[in-house]
């Protein structure tokens, strides 16, 4: 036996007067007694707040405010709390013996609005030993405690093992948990449910008959039949949808051609533009790629031209530099030629001057000889004149001396004097101061020897002098010759120089003889050197052109390679034309083939599109025509099989629908005739009585009653007996059972229950064994379960039927499509894919184009290589003969060596040429140079010195001899000279003096003559010398000029210079022609580059424009593709056959479709606007949006419950298949769904009867309730008269109003409302719509009127009104009604709650003192019988012997207010238990 949950205690923490107080609640009645303001209402308010923590509902007022709509500002809660955290908790033990602490944390909110903050929470699993106050407070001293905050409470609870704390943010969650745990009687899902519960508690608290309860007693007592309402709503929705679908089908049938036209024209309009844009995009892409290729090729060509221009500019610079060098060389060569010519002229002048000089030299030599001879004669004359002069002087001196010695004495005296003079003179001359007459002999010998030596020297010098005098002229001539040859030479070195010159003259003459051979050799070598330089220049040019350095030794092998390469390139160039022609022919063939395939491709694509559709529709793949024809035969067989299966499903479906219709009868009557019989007999169907039987009990009762489960229960069988005789329309077996339908039980049969079966003793000798049915149908729950399974099965069969019907239609359509396909496309569909072949051929064409372009490039490159190779070969042919020159590394050295030798030989030649004759003249005179002409003078001086020395020696010897001779004279000191002895000598001397003077005069005359002649000769010599010197100077100048010219003026020099000049002129002309050619080529190249740059700029501009168009088109195209793919219309729009049409054709196609579309969408504003927007050619995505809008429009028009596809095109294709089938099926479905008005009336009546029976059962519990004069209380339930009329018309006169119920424009609810208005025209419906009124009429509660009646005194049964009853009677009557409501709620929520949970029952009653003792006892009895807890408040203990009583006294102590509580347990049945506690 499941026990009912109970409230164990109520705990208040920090309430006004209650710091921490727990009230243990009695299992029946808990009484709160005390005076006014003791805290009774506060305690109940705390209980109600913990039970319903909704500030929008809580309003605690006094009983004096019972009728008021508003109370105090704080609604009675704020003033009951103290500052800080407050708690109100309920300790509950439910049917599962689970202890649950539910409560709220309250806290005053500061402010003038006096608000209160409430937080609900629960604590589960709290041990029994722990009291709520222990968990909510914390002891801080011996007599002090602190209230915990909610967070601290949560932390403390979480520390306990097995205890759960849960805080709630919504009251719904809080009440949901309380319902699941059995704390509240019903699930409070919404604020309306909470309001009803609060109104119930409030009515109980303040007592009396609550008008809020009685006015809406139906809402409190009668459960909402949501299942019936939902069934009606679902039925109406299904009917509405069915009718809308049928209407949509009819509209679709009427609009089918419009749909086809719209989708066809929209597809043509958009697909043509889509494919045109696709084609243009491809064309633009190809154009952009072509422009990019042209751009790249032009850039490459420009780069090549720029490289060529750079190379030519470099070559031009080189040529210009070379031209400058050549011009310089040419100018130098011209200048050299001029110099050579000048030198030749100079050489001629030099030769003339040389000839003149030779002649002058010869004349000058002759004149020199004449002058020399004249000078010698002059010298002789001078010597003779001097001798004559000397002789005159000596004679004069001698004459004078001899005159003085005329006297002997005088002579002796003179001799002595002379001896003395001689001695002094000897001493002076000999520088002998010691000389005396005595030692004079000794000194005389030595001085005589000196005199002898001096004489010998003088003789030798005289000899030399005579010889020198003889060779003096030749020496001067030879010295002049040496000076002429060697320049200024020391006279002492003249002989050595002359010897060297004569010795070198032979080699000089040999070298001079080698000049011409060396010149020829040098000319030859210089020619070879120039050729070598030209060859090196050619080799450098060749290497530069070929980009590689070559050695001369490699040229022969390179020539062989070049020859082989030229031969190869020549063959390649020769083959290039044939190869290119072959490629061109293949390209033309491919283009012709592509044209043919392009013509055939649309036909093949259309066939493939049809084949793809057929493959998608059939799910098969077809490889050849045989498979297509075989599949057509299979389609015929499949159609026959599917038709048979569909008919079988239809039969099964009809059977199930019959079962559903039979089980759907009201009251569980499978035969509608039984309802009529039950009404006729005034009975009730047994199935109706057991209509509320649970699903678990249904098999038992079904087996218990067996075939009689469809019996009619009547109150008296005898009254029915007479009516049985005339029965015609009734089942074959009709069971009648006597019993009270209001209190029927199953005691009719003696029954024994077995395992899944029962044995029923029908009579003494008749038993019936019935097994529990596998699918019970007894009771509403069993029938609903069976109906649900049957409906599911029916839905499955309906779906199968629809699928099979669709398959049949689809197969038929598919067969027709195959027939059309065979007749139209079978001939071409299995051909090879022309597009694949086109792609292959296009790829091959691209390869051929690239091959031809590459081939042309390679051919051009080969031609260039061929030309380069030929040019290189030509250069090599020039170089090959010069390899030996290139390899001759010593040529330059030899040229320099020969040039040095030639310089030497030319120098020698010039020397011989200049001095050859002089050397010839010098050769016989060289010996005379041994004596220097200046040495002749020296010799003369030496001779004069020797003569002086000899004279001095002679004088010294003479002086000594005179001293020696006059040694005797020293004795003549006293002698006188003898003058007479020398008289004859004087005469001789005079005579000789005369002769000498005459000779002297003659010599002087001759000297003057010779002097004049010498002067003449000297003048001639000077003239010749001057002329010779002038010509010599001129020759030197000419020679210097020739040397300054620096060229050799030989016979071949001019020819070589002219040849060199001509060669340089030719090279310069060639260079200039090459430069002019390069300039022309550079000009052409620059023009080509300018053209290419202009072309490049144009290409770049066109490419960027094209690329911008492509990018812009790509952005638009991406938007288009995104729209297309996101909406799945690519397959419809990407019609490949349109890709082969021209843009103008596609534009024309789109324009034609546009015109048709304008007419087609003229009545549709949305499509018309979208179509107008789509006409913008710059926004192609808008056409797609229009197509999508058309699709969406068609999707909306073709609903998914009609056509099973999202594609309107496929929907249109399926439409003809589906429309007829759906029309037929939906018509049948409407007939099936449309419930009859009689059925509706029966359902409402049976529901009313069921609820009336339930109210009667509730009334049985109120029969023993008595309060004061009230002996009994009951609920009276009556059907309203207007609604009874409506039910009668629905069940019996529905044919009269079929215009309402058969109208497709009205739902059943609207038709019901219209019928109600038709039956009750006097009733004002206000602003409510027929649908709202109809929905109200489908709710059975609106058919009933409920009122509370009391049996009071002599008045009998009266309507319970507060005015007709005393306060106690009203309180008791109201409490009875509330108990009935709570009990009704529990039964109503039984299915929602766990089977092992029976909820707590608790009500309140304030001011219970108004009840008398009998009423109190009745109330206590009611609580005991209904297992209900009651909390009452009274000024005094009204029933101390029962329940638990708390005496509350409010006291004030030291400005602190608290309530003193004394508890007393009832002593009527057990010993009293008194407890006292103060808080």
From Swiss-Prot:
<keyword id="KW-0238">DNA-binding</keyword>
<dbReference type="Pfam" id="PF13558">
    <property type="entry name" value="SbcC_Walker_B"/>
</dbReference>
<keyword id="KW-0226">DNA condensation</keyword>
<feature type="region of interest" description="Flexible hinge">
    <location>
        <begin position="666"/>
        <end position="783"/>
    </location>
</feature>
<dbReference type="Pfam" id="PF04310">
    <property type="entry name" value="MukB"/>
</dbReference>
<dbReference type="InterPro" id="IPR050308">
    <property type="entry name" value="MukB/SMC"/>
</dbReference>
<dbReference type="GO" id="GO:0005737">
    <property type="term" value="C:cytoplasm"/>
</dbReference>
<dbReference type="InterPro" id="IPR027417">
    <property type="entry name" value="P-loop_NTPase"/>
</dbReference>
<comment type="similarity">
    <text>Belongs to the SMC family. MukB subfamily.</text>
</comment>
<feature type="binding site">
    <location>
        <begin position="34"/>
        <end position="41"/>
    </location>
    <ligand>
        <name>ATP</name>
    </ligand>
</feature>
<comment type="subunit">
    <text>Homodimerization via its hinge domain. Binds to DNA via its C-terminal region. Interacts, and probably forms a ternary complex, with MukE and MukF via its C-terminal region. The complex formation is stimulated by calcium or magnesium. Interacts with tubulin-related protein FtsZ.</text>
</comment>
<dbReference type="Pfam" id="PF16330">
    <property type="entry name" value="MukB_hinge"/>
</dbReference>
<dbReference type="GO" id="GO:0005524">
    <property type="term" value="F:ATP binding"/>
</dbReference>
<feature type="coiled-coil region">
    <location>
        <begin position="511"/>
        <end position="603"/>
    </location>
</feature>
<dbReference type="InterPro" id="IPR042501">
    <property type="entry name" value="MukB_hinge_sf"/>
</dbReference>
<feature type="coiled-coil region">
    <location>
        <begin position="780"/>
        <end position="810"/>
    </location>
</feature>
<keyword id="KW-0175">Coiled coil</keyword>
<feature type="coiled-coil region">
    <location>
        <begin position="337"/>
        <end position="418"/>
    </location>
</feature>
<dbReference type="GO" id="GO:0007059">
    <property type="term" value="P:chromosome segregation"/>
</dbReference>
<keyword id="KW-0067">ATP-binding</keyword>
<dbReference type="InterPro" id="IPR032520">
    <property type="entry name" value="MukB_hinge"/>
</dbReference>
<dbReference type="GO" id="GO:0051301">
    <property type="term" value="P:cell division"/>
</dbReference>
<protein>
    <recommendedName>
        <fullName>Chromosome partition protein MukB</fullName>
    </recommendedName>
</protein>
<feature type="coiled-coil region">
    <location>
        <begin position="847"/>
        <end position="1116"/>
    </location>
</feature>
<dbReference type="InterPro" id="IPR007406">
    <property type="entry name" value="MukB_N_dom"/>
</dbReference>
<keyword id="KW-0131">Cell cycle</keyword>
<dbReference type="InterPro" id="IPR012090">
    <property type="entry name" value="MukB"/>
</dbReference>
<keyword id="KW-0547">Nucleotide-binding</keyword>
<dbReference type="GO" id="GO:0006260">
    <property type="term" value="P:DNA replication"/>
</dbReference>
<dbReference type="GO" id="GO:0003677">
    <property type="term" value="F:DNA binding"/>
</dbReference>
<comment type="function">
    <text>Plays a central role in chromosome condensation, segregation and cell cycle progression. Functions as a homodimer, which is essential for chromosome partition. Involved in negative DNA supercoiling in vivo, and by this means organize and compact chromosomes. May achieve or facilitate chromosome segregation by condensation DNA from both sides of a centrally located replisome during cell division.</text>
</comment>
<dbReference type="GO" id="GO:0009295">
    <property type="term" value="C:nucleoid"/>
</dbReference>
<feature type="coiled-coil region">
    <location>
        <begin position="1206"/>
        <end position="1265"/>
    </location>
</feature>
<keyword id="KW-0132">Cell division</keyword>
<keyword id="KW-0963">Cytoplasm</keyword>
<keyword id="KW-0159">Chromosome partition</keyword>
<dbReference type="GO" id="GO:0030261">
    <property type="term" value="P:chromosome condensation"/>
</dbReference>
